[in-house]
């Protein structure tokens, strides 16, 4: 039986769907044995604790979030590692990712079909899926000759509420607004 160590939170819909998909794949192609470390485990024991746990359990693969590349998991464990990182794509490991630029282009096309000429984007700075959605959206808006407006921040919602409110009021109307997150 293949042992898969999961470093996945289950608080978001994406994560829950990912977990369901892994279980379904295991049923069709397994059997796989999953073990999900609680999200607090990394905070309590750090990367070395996760590495130690994976070695002791004799994991055959790791799937999940790994926020920094200070430990080379493949070198230390000699097993496949697939990551779903929030801020950036890993250059060391395989990545679970989406066609974020394509999502941005599709959003712009959706609004263009509804005859919008002003296109606004609200995003989070420094997060791969937000950055790439903006890029795709902006590229498509530029291609179709629309006007593009963007607001991006890495601050918490309560810190930027007034800035966002002012930005929204100043946008030319009518405007198509694409937000980075569902």
What does each model-found stretch correspond to?
Residues 1-61, 71-182:
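Bacterial carbohydrate/catabolite-sensing allosteric modules
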